[in-house]
Regions:
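Active-site loop/lid in soluble adenylation, ligation, and acyl-transfer enzymes
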Residues: 31-138
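Fold-independent oxyanion-binding glycine-rich loops
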Residues: 123-126, 166-168, 202-204, 225-229, ...
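C-terminal functional extensions of proteins
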Residues: 225-293
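Structural signal for hydrophobic packing residues in well-ordered secondary-structure cores
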Residues: 11, 15-22, 127, 186-189, ...
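Protein-protein interaction and targeting regions used for scaffolding, dimerization, and localization
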Residues: 1-45
């Protein structure tokens, strides 16, 4: 028999085996099944729509109720099953998909029209690109010369509160959370809106951009709403950093932070209401961070 005939025969046998449904091998093997579900490749299931907390993959768990309860306590990848020593295909694909979302969020940028849409003065750190922002955090804490001049000419000085929105390490956060968060926070400070300074948006900005802006505008307090480093499945997490008397040389321990603001953590509207209460406490005490008792 010619070599090509042997190869064709082997391929045909393999394809036949793949079309069969076999039982799991003894010793914890996995089922080798390829079922025809009528999917022609044009309607592939979106893995992102699967709720991992309710997706039970372990066959015949010893304590099913405890397994279900454990899964509901966290969105982390616990209680997944395996094929030999490898993860199942859907588990691996979901991991890759969530990792891609996190990468896109870090490397993405907020649309140029966003600041103007919400009447924010758009400023930029000394970073010239996203790559420089990721590798030079020191430059992300300082404003470039053009932004300094813009702040001096366009922003109100000596306000009670300066609101700063920053893209941070997750560009998805700004559009998904910021409008609801700011609206709730201002609603909590109803009747006191005129004590807020000109809101600003910082591109390629770190938390300490608060210090550079505070040094120029001299507000009593400042709040930075910033996109945090995304995790797997949590690419929209925001934190709010509040500093009393923001200025150059301010140390990290002087900032008060509220983190994990996203739909799977503290919802934006709820966080906004909490921040309004917290801001009042900080302004009354004239202190923030470890100095707030």
């Amino acid at each position: 028999m010619a070599m090509e005939d042997n190869i064709r025969l082997i391929v045909e046998q393999v394809l036949q085996e793949l079309g069969k449904t076999s039982q799991p091998a003894a010793g914890g093997g996995c089922p080798a099944t390829v079922a025809d579900n009528g999917n022609d490749g044009n309607n592939i299931e979106d893995l992102a729509k699967v709720d991992l907390q309710r997706y039970l993959q372990v066959p015949e768990p010893k304590n099913r109720s405890l397994y279900e309860e454990m899964k509901l306590t966290t969105p982390a990848r616990i209680g997944v099953w395996r094929c030999g020593t490898r993860p199942l295909t859907d588990t691996w694909l979901r991991f890759r998909a969530d990792h891609a979302v996190a990468q896109d969020s870090v490397l993405g940028e907020v649309p140029e029209e966003f600041p103007a849409k919400y009447n924010m003065v758009s400023v930029k750190s000394m970073c010239e690109s996203k790559d420089e922002y990721l590798t030079r955090p020191d430059l992300g804490r300082k404003l470039d010369e053009e932004s300094l001049n813009l702040i001096r000419s366009k922003c109100r000085k000596g306000a009670k509160l300066q609101i700063i929105v920053a893209d941070g390490l997750s560009s998805n956060v700004v559009e998904s959370n910021i409008t609801r968060l700011v609206a709730a926070k201002l609603q909590g400070r109803e009747g006191k809106k005129n004590d807020a300074g000109t809101p600003s948006f910082g591109k390629f900005a770190r938390v300490a951009i608060m210090d550079a802006i505070g040094e120029e505008l001299k507000p009593e307090a400042a709040i930075v709403l910033l996109g945090e480093r995304p995790g797997l499945g949590t690419a929209e997490s925001m934190s709010a950093y509040i500093g009393y008397n923001p200025r150059a040389g301010m140390v990290e321990s002087e900032r008060t932070v509220v983190s994990n603001i996203h739909k799977g953590g503290t919802p934006a509207a709820e966080a906004g209401a909490h921040l309004a209460t917290l801001l009042k406490k900080i302004l009354d005490a004239k202190a923030s961070g470890v100095n707030l008792h």
